[in-house]
């Protein structure tokens, strides 16, 4: 299968859409009109350069509807095997695995992808891929976009990113396949690879084909991030979505593995004399994530490093635990169901904190966790 296929039943009316989403028609109309007020905005730092990215998180009512849209619509689509990211069993590792042991690897990045996806193209997904009626398609488009764009942080945004090129990407895939090339896309990262060395003309042709597809959607390729690597070049990193693909399976580079060992060494030294500061908690969590990545990629060193980290897990001091107890009592006295999104976030954070308390006081942690969990809705 080279083209996305919707396996659900087309929705023909707004009343049918309301029924599918499990809400009354009047409430659906109200939510559509209030979408612009239904997001929380914040910034996160991404990448090595700590670039700030705007994130828009839907509030509780809209989030519930978007999750329902995912379940009833986007999760009923068969996605082509060349798509990776935000799909079950398909992530940056499976994406890199497509391009192992290749002679030539070309990586391209779509500029400012999510905010550049137009409302018109989102509507086309519902209307022309799912075959929904025009008014249903427009209503759904309003529910999953913000200010005429696809918001980063929206529950449906990554599905939309995967489906944007539904009517043209399969043509590009087939064209490249006929040329003996492998193609994959991890959301905004496009990779093409070859079992043979490509000539300059062939590489130029491949890149032009990708440009042609994305330009149809008023998008562009970030030229500064375009890379072309060759296995015969000893200085080449041969990297796809951050992983080394020179051999049969994706791996971390030696430099990355060495850096992770160094981080764990620093963590072990610091953990020998204090494990309760915020700085130590942040360092340990960072190390833990890196070691988990090593484990997923089959690096045997991960077992040893995980054992070291398990002996120096972060803890809280008595002062912090006293503050948590007071805060938990406040939540238990003041919070009453149904909880707001903010209250749910606070309790989730508190449960995380009491997991850490459990490392030094299991009975206390168990007591407060049981009480706090009782406040949460079924999820």
Curated annotation (Swiss-Prot):
Mg(2+) binds at residues 109, 188-189. GO terms for biological process: defense response to virus. It catalyses: DNA(n) + a 2'-deoxyribonucleoside 5'-triphosphate = DNA(n+1) + diphosphate. GO terms for molecular function: metal ion binding; RNA binding; RNA-directed DNA polymerase activity. Keywords: Antiviral defense, Magnesium, Metal-binding, Nucleotidyltransferase, RNA-binding, RNA-directed DNA polymerase, Transferase. Pfam families: RVT_1. Residues 1-245 form the Reverse transcriptase domain. It comes from the Bacteria. InterPro entries: DNA/RNA_pol_sf, Reverse_transcriptase_msDNA, RT_dom. The keyword S-adenosyl-L-methionine does not apply. PROSITE patterns: RT_POL. CDD domains: RT_Bac_retron_II (cd03487). Disulfide bonds: none annotated. Its EC number is 2.7.7.49. Belongs to the bacterial reverse transcriptase family. Reverse transcriptase (RT) component of antiviral defense system retron Se72, composed of a non-coding RNA (ncRNA), this reverse transcriptase (RT) and the following cold shock-like protein. Expression of retron Se72 confers protection against bacteriophage lambda. At multiplicity of infection (MOI) of 0.02 cultures slow growth when infected with lambda but do not collapse, at MOI 2 cultures enter growth stasis. Responsible for synthesis of msDNA (a branched molecule with RNA linked by a 2',5'-phosphodiester bond to ssDNA). This is Retron Se72 reverse transcriptase. It comes from Salmonella heidelberg (strain 579083-10). The gene is ret.
């Amino acid at each position: 299968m080279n083209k996305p296929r919707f396996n659900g039943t087309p929705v023909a009316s707004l009343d049918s859409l309301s029924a599918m989403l499990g809400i009354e028609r009047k409430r659906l109309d109200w939510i559509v009109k209030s979408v612009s007020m239904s997001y929380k905005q914040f910034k996160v730092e991404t990448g090595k350069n700590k670039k700030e990215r705007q994130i828009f998180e839907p509030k509780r009512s809209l989030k519930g509807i978007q999750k329902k849209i995912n379940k009833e619509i986007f999760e009923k689509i068969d996605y082509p095997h060349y798509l990776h990211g935000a799909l079950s069993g398909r992530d940056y590792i499976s994406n890199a695995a497509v391009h192992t042991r290749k002679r030539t690897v070309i990586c391209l990045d779509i500029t400012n992808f999510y905010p550049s996806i137009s409302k018109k193209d989102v509507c086309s997904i519902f209307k022309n891929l799912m075959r929904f009626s025009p008014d249903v398609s427009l209503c759904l488009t309003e529910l999953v976009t913000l200010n005429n764009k696809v918001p980063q942080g929206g529950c449906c945004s990554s599905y939309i990113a995967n489906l944007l090129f539904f009517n043209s990407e399969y043509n590009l895939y087939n064209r490249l396949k006929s040329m003996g090339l492998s193609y994959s896309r991890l959301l905004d990262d496009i990779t093409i690879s070859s079992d043979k060395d490509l000539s300059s003309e062939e590489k130029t042709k491949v890149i032009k084909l990708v440009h042609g597809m994305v330009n149809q959607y008023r998008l562009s390729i970030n030229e500064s991030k375009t890379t072309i690597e060759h296995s015969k070049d000893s200085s080449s990193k041969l990297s796809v979505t951050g992983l080394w693909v020179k051999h049969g399976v994706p791996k971390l580079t030696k430099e990355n593995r060495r850096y992770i060992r160094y981080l764990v060494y620093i963590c072990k030294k610091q953990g020998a004399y204090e494990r309760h500061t915020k700085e130590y908690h942040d360092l340990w969590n960072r190390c833990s994530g890196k070691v988990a990545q090593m484990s997923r990629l089959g690096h045997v060193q991960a077992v040893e490093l995980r054992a070291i980290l398990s002996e120096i897990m972060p803890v809280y001091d008595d002062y912090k635990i006293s503050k948590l107890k007071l805060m938990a009592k406040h939540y238990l006295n003041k919070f009453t169901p149904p909880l707001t999104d903010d209250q749910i976030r606070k309790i989730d954070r508190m449960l995380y904190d009491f997991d850490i308390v459990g490392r030094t006081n299991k009975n206390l942690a168990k007591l407060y966790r049981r009480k706090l969990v009782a406040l949460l809705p079924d999820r």
